[in-house]
Amino acid sequence: MGDFAAPSARLVAAARGLLALDQPDTNTVGMLRDAGVPLAPGTAQAFRDIVLATPGLDRAVNGILLDPATLHRVTGSGSTPALHRVRVPVGVRMGDENLRSFDVAGSVDGIVDDIARHRAAGASFARWRIVAMADTAVTELRARARLVAGWAASCVTGGLTPFVDVVAIPGARDGVHEAATAHGEAVRTVLDALRTEGVHLDEVVLGSSIVTPGRRASDVATAEDVARATLRGLRTAGAEDLAGV
């Protein structure tokens, strides 16, 4: 993997998106089974290795997201493709709504070493996902946002681009307007926490769920409705200040 002067810019330079290879083995095995691929022990690992060794991968995606185990296995094994041969930014999944030893006030004691290890292994960005359900209390969402903001600040200090993934899940009967409002508020809460923590938004890449009505909503949204509602929510939240979405 090359040394990218502006990894956040590289992640969003072309409209190719990120390739997520960080799913649990059970998810990968299920996908391969549905595709009719013969399964054996180690099939999921072999699938990831094949993808990483694909010629021209840098022309197809803007970045690759790995789970921590795969990142460090690929780095430490001579039988798998070295990350320096992958000519796209490689990221690592760090947050999955598991607070571990971190308190909800945003303390990230103990995670700095993880960031340093991932950086040394070849990662240039890291992702943390924050999920806002329809019934998530405002105080709880703010606490999660503070935690993510503290993590993002540590990433910037440690040389990783923070990729903050905000997923807003609407209520079952929410229409597209209600869903857009909830989505915008979730993104705004996270961005406000980042600013409060002193993180420059132009150093952050945002992942965002799209705005769709709840599964039991009475209204039907077209693809254009979904696109407009999603963009409206992002603009209202101030997402234009980010490195990219």
Outline where the language-model segments fall.
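Hydrophobic beta-strand scaffold residues
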Residues: 90, 162-163
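Alpha/beta catalytic barrel-like cores
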Residues: 1-121, 134, 219, 223, ...
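Structured alpha-helical segments in the cores of large, soluble enzyme domains
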Residues: 108-125, 144-160, 186-197, 226-236
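Short, ordered loop/turn segments at secondary-structure junctions
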Residues: 24, 69, 130-133, 166-169, ...
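Conserved, mostly hydrophobic/aromatic
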Residues: 40, 128, 165, 206
